Amino acid sequence: DISEAAYSAISAGQDTADAVTFVSEANTLAKAGFTDMDTAVDTLTTTLNAYGMETDQVSRVSDKLITTQNLGKTTVNELGSSLGKLIPTAAMYNVSLDELSAAYVTTTKNGIATAESTTYINSMLNELGKSGSKSADILSEKTGKTFSELMDSGYTLSEVLQILQDEADSSGKSMADM
């Protein structure tokens, strides 16, 4: 199991010299996250690779996943099955792992299953980033920037959503109309 995990980590781009540290962290994540080594390794490598992180960040990523599990109504096993579908989109728009974790905590805590949360968050990010969408038009009108440009310039996802909420409030619409 350990040797397979090391092989999987190295195959996914982790440095051979750091494989022992990586596998040790994956083992800890598997135990604390109610999952198996394969899922832990896959989730960690997917996250590190998508965000361009080095192996020295594996502990930070693992801690963030455990925190998401502890604060939300999800498990690392459920996150592991879903994150791979969302992280590429989030990374493309410069939405941080911290912001993704907060979104998962909020949605799962409110009774939305992890897989469904993934679909909702992914759709939201794509809608915000899609040229010509109502949300994109509002962001451009209010800031002169696209969603990607706002995220690249240091805005947080919460700040971007607040711009839309403010517009909804001032126009008497709901966020769903944005």
What do the PLM-derived regions correspond to, one by one?
Residues D1-M178:
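Amphipathic alpha-helical interface segments used for oligomerization, scaffolding
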